Amino acid sequence: MTNREEIERRRTFAIISHPDAGKTTLTEKLLLYGGAINQAGSVKGKQSAKHAVSDWMDIEKQRGISVTSSVLQFNYAGKCVNILDTPGHQDFSEDTYRTLMAADSAVMVIDAAKGVEAQTIKLFKVCTLRHIPIFTFINKMDREARDPFELMENIEEILGIKTYPMNWPIGCGKEFKGVFDRNTRKVLAFSSDGRANGVKKVDETEAELGDPALDELLTPYLHQQLVDEIELLDGVAEEFDLDKVLRGELSPVFFGSALTNFGVEPFLENFLRLTPTPLARVDSLTGETVDPCRDEFSAFIFKIQAYMNKAHRDRIAFMRICSGKFERGMEAFHVQEGKNIKLATGTQLMAQDRAIVDEAYAGDIIGLFDPGIFSIGDTLCTGKKKVQFAGIPTFSPEHFARIEQKDTMKRKQFVKGMEQIAQEGAIQIFREVGGGMEEVVVGVVGVLQLEVLEYRLNTEYNVEIRMQQLPFEQLRWVQNDPDTYNLRDLDLTSDTKAVEDMKGNRLLLFTSDWAVRWAETHNETLKLSEFGNI
C-alpha cells in the first residue's frame, strides 16, 4: 500500500460531551465493534471489577470520570480509526481543548433525556473555531427520552447549527426497538437477551418500512408511528449536503444507546463513510497549507503525560502526524529547539497498554518517549523547507492555591512532580517575579484539578502537600516588553499580585473583574491578554 493510500484510510476524531452523557461508554462500544477489545468494560464499576478501557488512571476508575484524554486505535472496514476520548468533566476542559487541536472531526454525544448541556456548548464552540465537521450521537434512547423532533430543535436553537437525522429512533426507554436508516430506507430492529448487559455485539434484523412482519417485530403501534414520523420527517427535513457537513455547518444526527449497543454499529459505518481523511494544516510561518500526503514528515505535540503506567516511570509526548510517514529511528528537526533529534521509539497506546510502532502516517497519534525535551505545541519536521504549526493556546485559570510540601526533606521530589505535572498542561505554576520554588502558586481551570494534583503528588512522587486556597479569580498575561516596562510602576488594586510563569512570562493575578478593569483603565500603556502560548 502506498503512503497516500495509507493516509487516505485514516480517520481521526475526538468524542466530546457533557459529563455523564455516555461518551466513554460509546468509545468502549466502538472499540468492541472495531475488534480492539473482545468484551466491553463498564464505567459503572459497582457490580464488577471492570472499568472503561480508556480510563487508565486510578482516580478515574475510582470516580468513574475521565480526567485525561485517551488515544485509542483500531481498524474497521478498511479504515484505520484513531479515537481521542476526552475528559467530560468541566474541570478538565483545557485538556479537551488541546486534544481537539489534534482531531479532524468531532462526535458530540448528547443525553436523550437532557438535550444540549453547558459543557457541550463550550466544547462545541472550540470545534466551530476550527471549522471541523461535527457529528451528533443522541445517546441513552434505552431510557425515557425527549421527543426526537424536540431534540433536533434543541440542538439547532442552542448551538446554531443545522441538523440532519441520518437515522430515526423507533420508540424509547423499554420500547426502544431499533432505528430507521434514512440512507438505505431500511428498518434495523435490535434484539438482545438482556443477559449480556451490552458487553457483546447486538443482533440486528433488517426489513423494509412497509414489511408486515414489522408489526410483530416492533408492535403495530410503533410500526405505524414510525411510518407517520418518517413521512413527516421527509417533508420538513433539510436536504443532506456533505459539503456543509465538512465545513461544520450541518451536523448529521444518529440515535442509539451505547449501553445496550443499539445503533452503535450503524453509526460507526455511516460516520466512517462521511468523516474526512486527515485535514491539511497551516504552516504558521508562511500561511501555506501542508498537504498530508506530501513526502516530508511533519507533526506537533499536543499532550504530555507522565507516569501513565506504574511499570513505566516515564513521560510520553503525544504526537499528531500532519504529513508524510513516521519510521522508528528516523531523525526529525525539532523546530523550537532548533536541532535534529532521533525519534528512537514510537508507541501506540491503548489506555495504559502500549506497543512499539515501526511506522505511522498522517492522521495517526503516537506516543514518543520524552526525556524532558518536548513541550506542548512543539513542531517536528523533515525536509529542506521547515514548517511550524501554530502554538496551542493556554487558558486563563479560574482557581488558585498556594502549595508547599509537608516534609522539607522531600523538596527534590516536590519540585520534580510539580514541574512534570505542569509540563503536561494539567496545572500552571506561578512564582514571585525573580523568585524560585519557595512559594508556589498553582492555577487550574477547575477545583477538581487541585484534588487530582494532590492525589498524583502523593501516589506518583510520594509527596504530601499543604494547600491554601487563594482569593484570585482572574489572570492576565502582560504583553509589554519586560526590559522597558516595570510592573512596580503600575497603578493596581492592593490585592492584585504580580507573578511569573515557568518560562519567565509576567502575569497579574486579580481577585475580581473590577480589579482587571482598574488595571486597564489606570494604566493606559498596559497590554494584557487572557491567553498565553504553551
Model-derived regions, located:
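Structural and coupling elements of P-loop NTPases
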Residues: 1-534
